[in-house]
């Protein structure tokens, strides 16, 4: 089919309705008015359209669903070594590759008719509403999330208001100054850190990367891939679960994750030549879930082994899955509907589920609950996040 907006954004205005309504943040009338305004902006901004990669929408949703379970299992992990859905953090690298691919596909041939300011405005309109909604939900729920891991009783209302404003404006907090005490860039809604890097990638694309020749872009991808591999294999962590804090290793690792994945997606969009593949969505979905669910490899004594696995996923497997997903088509009604549903929920699900994860985490820690004891609430959290 043909998308009503450009194929790159995957963030429709009805996201505001789906998740703001489920979170109870707005009244129905205000939500409908917001949706109409966003639709008007979208229609005016994109008179021309391109074919839409429905399967990539669906794969983004599959990865987002897996991330929710990855975060649910954080409540029972003692470290990265024993967490279930152990490699769920790699979904961010998959998102970055998808983002680079669809942005290159949608915008590379439009720069003669579009300014940098217009591009950045479009991206801001598409991405930022959910950043604000996530910050507001996080602020409203903050005082219900106190536990032994973080003490919320010492946080004053002015401190909370300041944190809300910073989160909503995507201004990162430095370690020691954020209100939860976990050194997160965005303590009210942790996953916002990836939007910080997403914005950085969009800015780099608008001012610099789009101007590179395909050969020069290939060099950038190669060098960034080497840097990412070195960080993963020989770095101090044995993984690339970084980018969420304003520390040296997080900034270096997060930047490498962005530079490789986003640039690789852009490069793939330039050289992409589809092949015929049947059942691409279902095959790729199983691969995404399987790759993200692999247990930690190598243990604490062989960190490099897990780093090697992370490198394989980020550098080899994910670009291949994006290629296969872009090559396939949702030819039957069931697949098409599933992909549309998953595409519709993917971004808002990712951006607003985590404040509820904080609440679940605190409940588990305060009650010293096992996963089996908390399973009904875990399921309620999952389906409550997914179902409009």
What are these regions (language model features)?
Residues 123, 127-131, 345-352:
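Loop-to-transmembrane-helix entry motif
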Residues 218-228, 280-289:
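Central hydrophobic cores of alpha-helical transmembrane segments
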Residues 1-47:
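Short, intrinsically disordered terminal tails adjacent to the first/last structured region
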Residues 56, 118-119, 127, 194, ...:
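Alpha-helical transmembrane segments and their helix-entry boundary regions
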Residues 39-55, 62-88, 104-117, 173-182, ...:
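Alpha-helical transmembrane segments in multi-pass integral membrane proteins
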Residues 127-199, 227-248, 312-326:
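Membrane-interface helix-loop-helix regions
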Residues 103-123, 146-156:
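Membrane-helix interface linkers and caps
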Residues 67, 96, 102, 135-138:
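Helical transmembrane-bundle signal
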